[in-house]
């Protein structure tokens, strides 16, 4: 067993790449270690293309084992189940980073599995998994020539932090992950606290500078440990077939791509495709027999060339816009009468109905991870039904990876403006229903979420808007597109989503299909996105620019009380009897804390006011000189104890009773008396006198 190792430093932390010791039957197997974190990443490459495959079947699976953190899983089976949303997001991050580095037309299946074997809690293992995925690919024999690496960058007190730990990130205004090759940037994912575009760009370039150390180490490992390159073929469009289709149908295709309506355009294109198939099948084009798949791929290539060349030549885009124009926007709030907050955001042929629901602490999501169980007060869910693109499909299933990814992006975009628990005690769930989609539904979700929360009275710090930028690049010539359509995303080279407030960026997500982009393109895309974002915010602000002061009449009420911690036991009562009585009488939810915090959550104001009044009565402090209506709770030889407030009793001597003209032998437990608090001694003992009738 021969083991190869590479060691390098990243942000003053030593990282070790090792191969040859584990999972040796995989085509590529690398363990990545940093401190007590260990991630095993394997790559398996199929040596042939499966019949009928017309895409690159790359799959990435990031898995966390609870034993890595010295824990036993919960649940009846006591074993790991389906991956969590966080694990799915990390799988997507790795996939998006490495996918652009494979040659076009490579259709061999590749499966990458990253398994967290040991975890120390200080650093997230996601970057180690990304580095390991690249290293295992580099030694697997796959056609992976442009080695990729990734790093995380933070930003605190005006300085960038390389490879920040979890504590660093808590204090950071930026959580940025960048991956790329030695020469270019491939993927960006970030969450930020309304930072200027210049800071975001600086962070991306800072990250890229430090990628080179990792890439050099991976290359050194591959030089000594790589398997021979597999034999593979590249699928290519038949040029003669393409020319034949173009000669007969190009005029029709060109005219069709001037139709702004997506549905009308697709109907016309489908008709042309049908005619193309009939033409090729009925004529002896060059003595060859072509499959329907080959014909349609050649047709698609003509579409791609046409759309791209039009844009690069400065001609109008598919829907007639120039590169910087935003589609028409329509904004409505309060569109659903029975919900707590709602908004309908429409941009061109993309429409999101976003609904906000307010809840109590008990509605918070409990998220289990290697770090333990975390309470999530802000949830954002994204649904993409098939009718949104005019198709039939499965409905009501578990969310797909794409839906999870889009929800996470929208949440990251709005997280920076979401109020903390002290300022806003509600738990909030936002749901985005995509009703129509023709590009950038995730950014419509960002805009709709901001509007919907403001409609619900959630005190977000600033409205947030998002925009998707695209890129068409051919050699040195390129065009950056604002607010891309679905076809421009599909046929273009970049999908760059930028969200933020009027002050700066709150989230970035960039994916590209080419071998990387330059600083110049990034700079232009960020500036163009800033202008577009401010335009969108301006339209949103015409409808609502700050949160409503009051929640909806149908929304639940919440009230937070801070009482003397010693009084919590009085509110709860023996065995919880007191608090249960309040709940049964008012219908409110009551949560208490040893710190003295009491949260009252009720379905309406009447219920809440009643519960608050009952609690205030229990915790009220007896004051000297005040008159109270109490009840006798105990008879003694020399006097009686009278309950005044809650569990507070006072002593009333018989002498005081007789002085007021009342006979002591007529007193019984439960009898009401009006008494005056004469004094309260240092021990808290209360002396009473009877108020004369």
Swiss-Prot record:
Domain S1 motif span(s) in chain numbering: 625-693
PANTHER family, per database record: POLYRIBONUCLEOTIDE NUCLEOTIDYLTRANSFERASE, POLYRIBONUCLEOTIDE NUCLEOTIDYLTRANSFERASE 1, MITOCHONDRIAL
Membership in a protein family: Belongs to the polyribonucleotide nucleotidyltransferase family.
Record function comment: Involved in mRNA degradation. Catalyzes the phosphorolysis of single-stranded polyribonucleotides processively in the 3'- to 5'-direction.
Disulfide bond positions: none
GO annotation (BP), single: mRNA catabolic process
Enzyme Commission code(s) on record: 2.7.7.8
Lineage: Bacteria, Pseudomonadati, Pseudomonadota, Gammaproteobacteria, Thiotrichales
GO molecular function, one term: 3'-5'-RNA exonuclease activity
KH domain ranges (all copies): 556-615
Class of this enzyme: transferase
Localization, UniProt: Cytoplasm
A Pfam family hit: RNase_PH
Protein name: Polyribonucleotide nucleotidyltransferase
UniProt superkingdom: Bacteria
Residues noted as binding Mg(2+) in the record, renumbered to the chain: 489, 495
Organism (species): Francisella tularensis subsp. holarctica (strain LVS)
